[in-house]
């Protein structure tokens, strides 16, 4: 008879969790940021609000975003006028969209990740699904299991309403699952669709308007597992993780699910709160490794907006190229909430290989991934690149 201790030992993986594949997807509808203010004020019947439109134009100009992808197009919005109003009861219409579309977009990203991984989907043991777009039972994790044809015994974990830090959360959870379940292969999917937060403009809540200038739709998927087989090709090791709530940050970023959809609230000092506390998080993460030069590591930071990135750079004295992959994703896709950091991870390994930089992390060994979001919550993931 085996002992509990022997069972426990047999469950543990030998080595650290690794990211083995990454896939991303966006809806087909692409919006150009330079023409978006005209479109947005026209489609929401708000063209009479000329001063507010000028403000919104300035927000879009300063956003450092070139384009975004959105499930909501003109046709869908014309069929759902309640979604275009600032505060009209519209939750049912929004739910009908996202309950269908969030798993579908997730499937597109997951299919790409599974293809790159190169193993049969029957080898997936765990599924983590994360979205801030809609809530339903059974959840998007169940819908995706059906859409992909995963085994009914796959162990599912559904994360709703986490917000922009959750790209870090899913990696932290996937690491714990992979390292504590020998042979586990975890499919992680973040799928975000702004149909829950889209609404017309108002001059009483400019933070709502900031969201309309920044948010985009996208889904990203990764396969995480320890002890890779010879046929599996790890991209990054997940070395260490942490989550913390920043001091004096209550109410800095809030979202509330109401009859009018998901409302978004933002305090102006979010970039200040993050930049003030970022060094503490880095010291905790990198002191054990003997690293104190933060220009010597590669960077993946959730691009909440350009002001956050600017202030973090200034506070730490980072060279402009450190945030290159992060700024590229912000520019090409906008803020896709939880999916962003996984898009950046994908961008980084692709550019590193294209440019012949020697490792998946821009030629460097060590890196950091940060998620920032409601709370204010900060997720920190220490990554180790692999040689290419």
Curated annotation (Swiss-Prot):
MF-aspect GO terms: acyltransferase activity, transferring groups other than amino-acyl groups; naringenin-chalcone synthase activity
Cysteine-cysteine disulfides: none
Active site: 164
CDD domains: CHS_like
Domain of life: Eukaryota
InterPro entries hit by this protein: Chalcone/stilbene_synt_C, Chalcone/stilbene_synt_N, Chalcone/stilbene_synthase_AS, Polyketide_synthase_type-III, Thiolase-like
Function of the protein: The primary product of this enzyme is 4,2',4',6'-tetrahydroxychalcone (also termed naringenin-chalcone or chalcone) which can under specific conditions spontaneously isomerize into naringenin.
Family recorded in the similarity comment: Belongs to the thiolase-like superfamily. Chalcone/stilbene synthases family.
Protein name: Chalcone synthase 5
Organism in which the protein naturally occurs: Glycine max
